[in-house]
Structure formats: structure tokens, C-alpha cells
Amino acid sequence: MSKTKDVKKVVLAYSGGLDTSIILKWLQTELGAEVVTFTADLGQGGELEPARKKAEMMGIKDIRIVDVREEFVADFVFPMFRANTVYEGTYLLGTSIARPLISKHLVDIARETGADAIAHGATGKGNDQVRFELSAYALNPDIKVIAPWRDWSFKSRTDLINFAEQHQIPVAKDKRGEAPFSVDANLLHSSSEGKVLEDPWSEPPEFVHQRTVSPMDAPDKVTEIEIEFLKGDPIALNGKKLSPATMLAALNDLGRDNGIGRLDLVENRFVGMKSRGVYETPGGAILIVAHRAIESITLDRGAAHLKDEFMPRYAELIYNGFWFSPERLMLQAMIDKSQEDVEGTVRLKLYKGNVMVTGRKSKKTLYSDALVTFEDDRGAYDQKDAAGFIRLNALRLRTLAARNRKG
């Protein structure tokens, strides 16, 4: 607590949920600090106005709700998708990629308002505390960060609910009148954790899924779409030009209706433990398939393979909170260079949780009908050349086999 005793004004990353509402009250009562709330409109939907009303009810005078949807998708989500980024083979990093943007705005507002510190609601067990703070320190090495979960005496959500009741802080309930799961949402994804999901053998109840219909309940008909790309980013859907945020929102709607993007996974947290979550990334699940498809005809083999080699490291940097690190920026420069000629159109069919590529075309294509045809290629490729190619590549293998045969 000693590092916070001189804090007079704090900028709080505020969602309006249980944790950050209690943190708001804690900052007021325990520190006697003036609190500025910052709520990022990341496309999470109906949480924004309730967050404003709750902050007003708790006496906050400076309430910042900032629409960052276009910035989020254009400057964070799309650069990540240029790399086909997946953490541990499955996770599209929907929570991870939002944290550096939130930290950026926290630092900016703290500078603007003359605040002594910023604060967040991430627990001491999770990744988000690392992501928020590494990003903040990368942008302002002298910033003071308050992380109440590491300082206060509360040990559980039950403790928080008891504190909320003592201070007349409204506690949200789910549709069944129970305390909700721990939920994070933005334009890219939604995640649900806690309660019954803490048992990795327990099947997630259907009501946990907030953004997608079950694949079993999706329509018994195919939805066909076309996505146009330029420099690795989607720019048009079914021939209509869309802004980055509008594009992702439209893909989300298509994914939602067709049961696409559900994921139940156990991941390795940066802090060392495993955690289980249920994630929904409907638009992102469509986008990554489409992006790989357009790369398949426009990206050189060597460049594509090198890019794939670096992708796990790039994904790990984002997951662990190093978005503003020099190594992430170095990799981003390489990735962006690779995307200069990644343009064209991909045709997809969406059906009951599946995303199927049915066509791809580009003015920058490297695909040659003349080279791959089973018919007469009119001299485009001399098959006799393959004999020397094989002979040279087999040289070391034959040498090794000859040695081993001698025994």
C-alpha cells in the first residue's frame, strides 16, 4: 500500500462489472483518491450505458467512454491477422489484443488529466495484469500502476459480492438470477470463464455462449460470401467496401448465424498455470481462413514458410503482453512486407460451424494454370528437368544410406 499512499487522482480501466465497480469504491474509500473512469467501446455492446450510470451513481465526475472500434480493428486486430496469428494452435487472441489499446488510452488520459496513477481490475493470477502493465510501462516508464487484486484483502468473488452489498453496489445477475461467469467481450470475441467451467471435464452449458447459435441449430442451408483483400487486410464483403470495424462486425453476424467460431480450450497462462475458457470468435474464424486462402495464391513459398515459422513467436508475444516490444515491432515489419501483394478475392461457404473455401483469385497470383495442368502445357514445364532436381536432392540421402549399409 505504501506505493499508493500519495496518490490523489487515478484513471481506472472501468467496465462497469463487479470487479472494477468494487475497485472504484475501494480507490475512493481506501485511498481517498479522485477517480477518472475510462471505458473503451471495443464493440462489446450493451455494457457501455450501464457502466456510465453506475459510475455516475458512485459519484464519478469525469467519465470517459471512448469509441475505439475502428482503431482497435485497423491498428491491432488486422495487423495480427496478417500473420495468421494463433496461440497454441487454437486461440485467436481476442482478449490479448485489446489490452495494449486500453493501456495506451489509460496512459494518454493520465497525462491529460494530471493523474498520479492508472488502475486496472485484472487479478493477480491472470495474464491481463501483465498485459496492461507491460504496455503501460512501454509507453510511459514512470507511470504508477495500481492493481488492487494484488493489494487488498479480498480473496474471492464471494468476498467481492459481500463488499458490494455492504456499499450498495449493484451486482449483475445472469438470466437465471445467478452471479454471472467472468466474461470479456469486444468486437473480435467473447470469453467466459469461472464457475462450472473451472472443471475441464464439465461440458459448457449452452447458455454460456453469447454470440453464436449452436452449429446443430444453425440453418440447414449454405451461406456463400466473397471477401476482397488488399495488402493482407479485408476491404470489401460481397463487393461492398467496408471500414475495418464494420467489416469485422459484418463477419461476426455471418459467423453468429452459422454457428462459427466456438472454442473450448485449456491454455497455458504466462504466469504459469493452465486455465479453461469458452471463447467465441465468429468473424475472426472466417477471416483467418479467408486470409490463408488469398495468401496461398499470392505469397511465395519461401516467404510463406518463413512467416509460418515466426507466427508462434509472434502469437506468444501478443499473448504475453509484449505488443509494444521491439521484437514484436520487428516481426510486424516483416509480416507487413510479406503482405504487399496479398490482394484479391476469396469465395467461401459457411455451413453449421464450418468455413469452406471454394475459390480464390488475384491479379497478383503466382498460380499458373500452364504449369500445373494435366493436359498439354505447350512447353511451359519440361518434366525431364525433375530427374536432375531429384538426383541432387537425393545425393546426401544416398551417401548416408551407402555409409549405413557398410555398417
UniProtKB/Swiss-Prot annotation:
Taxonomy, superkingdom: Bacteria
Keywords assigned: Amino-acid biosynthesis, Arginine biosynthesis, ATP-binding, Cytoplasm, Ligase, Nucleotide-binding
A Gene Ontology molecular function term of the record: argininosuccinate synthase activity
E.C. number(s) listed in UniProt: 6.3.4.5
Gene Ontology biological process terms from the UniProt entry: argininosuccinate metabolic process; L-arginine biosynthetic process; urea cycle
Binding site for L-citrulline: Y91, S96, N127, R131, S182, S191, E267, Y279
Keyword Disulfide bond carried by entry: no
Binding site for L-aspartate: T123, N127, D128
Disulfide bonds: none
Record's subunit section: Homotetramer.
Family in the record: Belongs to the argininosuccinate synthase family. Type 1 subfamily.
Protein name from the UniProt record: Argininosuccinate synthase
Organism: Mesorhizobium japonicum (strain LMG 29417 / CECT 9101 / MAFF 303099) (Mesorhizobium loti (strain MAFF 303099))
Upper classification of the organism: Bacteria, Pseudomonadati, Pseudomonadota, Alphaproteobacteria, Hyphomicrobiales
